[in-house]
UniProtKB/Swiss-Prot annotation:
It is found in: Cell inner membrane. GO terms for biological process: proton motive force-driven ATP synthesis. Its main location: membrane. This is ATP synthase epsilon chain. GO terms for molecular function: ATP binding; proton-transporting ATP synthase activity, rotational mechanism. NCBIfam families: ATP_synt_epsi, PRK00571.1-4. InterPro entries: ATP_F1_dsu/esu_C_sf (IPR036794), ATP_synth_F1_dsu/esu (IPR001469), ATP_synth_F1_dsu/esu_N (IPR020546), ATP_synth_F1_esu_C (IPR020547), ATPsynth_dsu/esu_N (IPR036771). Pfam families: ATP-synt_DE (PF00401), ATP-synt_DE_N (PF02823). Belongs to the ATPase epsilon chain family. It is a peripheral membrane protein. It comes from Shewanella oneidensis (strain ATCC 700550 / JCM 31522 / CIP 106686 / LMG 19005 / NCIMB 14063 / MR-1). It comes from the Bacteria. One of its GO terms (cellular component) is proton-transporting ATP synthase complex.
Length: 142
């Protein structure tokens, strides 16, 4: 019996990052963790900055960092639209650590005109990238 799969397209503002048949997709939506498989009910959701984990048709996994965006689930396809998408292997861990430190420093020395929401978004993105890196390290260690 053939594996039940769904067409997945992951697109950034710059280019198409992934297009193919997948057994599953795991992302963090606005209301929590989402697991999408063949036959999932139609859905439209915001995606929080974080990890997208796919299990390809052949059973191999691939992990991406998403800066946030939109998820659309239709009966025959799933689309992920994000401003920034990075393959986990392409994330610069040191740059993410530095971005986290900068955001924390800005928040600690904030004045009256400080944009706290923007700093929180930058901090969330940096921390999400670091979580993706840690996940990859754990998988390699197994």
């Amino acid at each position: 019996m053939a594996a039940m799969t769904v067409q997945l397209d992951i697109v950034s503002a710059e280019s198409s990052i992934f297009s193919g048949r997948v057994a599953s997709l795991q992302v963090t939506g606005s209301e929590g963790e989402l697991g999408i498989m063949h036959g999932h009910a139609p859905l439209l959701s915001y995606i929080k900055p974080g990890m997208a984990r796919i299990v390809k048709q052949d059973g191999n996994e691939e992990v991406f960092y998403l800066s946030g965006g939109l998820l659309e689930v239709q009966p025959s396809s799933v689309s992920v639209l994000a401003d920034v998408v990075m393959r986990a292997k392409d994330i610069d861990e040191q740059a993410a650590l530095e971005a986290k430190r900068r955001a924390e420093a800005h928040m600690a020395t904030a004045g009256a005109d400080f944009n706290y929401d923007a700093a929180m978004v930058e901090l969330a993105k940096a921390m999400a990238q670091l979580r993706v890196v840690e996940t990859i390290k754990k998988n390699i260690a197994r």
